[in-house]
Amino acid sequence: MLTAAVLSCALLLALPATRGAQMGLAPMEGIRRPDQALLPELPGLGLRAPLKKTTAEQAEEDLLQEAQALAEVLDLQDREPRSSRRCVRLHESCLGQQVPCCDPCATCYCRFFNAFCYCRKLGTAMNPCSRT
């Protein structure tokens, strides 16, 4: 409660000071630009109307946009169709894929509760591809 009373008193004391600062402003009739309204003693604060584009700049911008559109179309035409892979190479992930490993002696080997799977050659005694 005491804090609210102190803040109220501070605000009431500060209001006359802010009103006195506003009294020194120029009358509103003679003001031509918004930067003169707030600070008449500082000319040119940089508040200017946006510059109009010249016809040369507009033509250059149109040419750039047209060139970008043509480049996108040409990129799509020159792109080769993706080759659908029928197998997974050695040491590449085979997790969730329904295609076999490219190497006939490799198998999809999974570790860490089937969270990490990759094509790997496994050497066993019964496997004809085993390393000897």
Curated annotation (Swiss-Prot):
> Which residue intervals define the domain Agouti in the entry?
87-129
- Places the protein is found: Secreted; Golgi apparatus lumen
| Main localization of the protein described in the UniProt heading | secreted
Q: From the UniProt annotation, give the residues forming the signal peptide.
A: 1-20
Q: Which domain of life is it from?
A: Eukaryota
**Any Gene Ontology CC annotation:** neuronal cell body
Does the record's keyword annotation contain Metal-binding?
Answer: no
Q: One GO molecular function term?
A: type 1 melanocortin receptor binding
Q: Which residue positions hold the site described Cleavage?
A: 82-83
Which tissues does the record link to its expression? Expressed primarily in the adrenal gland, subthalamic nucleus, and hypothalamus, with a lower level of expression occurring in testis, lung, and kidney.
> Keyword set for this entry?
Disease variant, Disulfide bond, Golgi apparatus, Knottin, Obesity, Secreted, Signal
Pfam families linked to this entry: Agouti (PF05039)
Cystine links in this protein are: 87-102, 94-108, 101-119, 105-129, 110-117
> Biological process GO annotation list?
adult feeding behavior; circadian rhythm; eating behavior; feeding behavior; hormone-mediated signaling pathway; long-day photoperiodism; maternal process involved in female pregnancy; neuropeptide signaling pathway
Propeptide spans which residues?
A: 21-82
Q: Where is this region: Interaction with melanocortin receptors?
A: 111-113
Which disease is noted in the annotation? Answer: Obesity: A condition characterized by an increase of body weight beyond the limitation of skeletal and physical requirements, as the result of excessive accumulation of body fat.
Quaternary structure and partners: Interacts with melanocortin receptors MC3R, MC4R and MC5R.
What role is this protein assigned?
A: Plays a role in weight homeostasis. Involved in the control of feeding behavior through the central melanocortin system. Acts as alpha melanocyte-stimulating hormone antagonist by inhibiting cAMP production mediated by stimulation of melanocortin receptors within the hypothalamus and adrenal gland. Has very low activity with MC5R. Is an inverse agonist for MC3R and MC4R being able to suppress their constitutive activity. It promotes MC3R and MC4R endocytosis in an arrestin-dependent manner.
Domain comment, as recorded: The presence of a 'disulfide through disulfide knot' structurally defines this protein as a knottin.
Annotated protein name in UniProt: Agouti-related protein
Tell me which species this is from: Homo sapiens
Q: Which gene encodes it?
A: AGRP
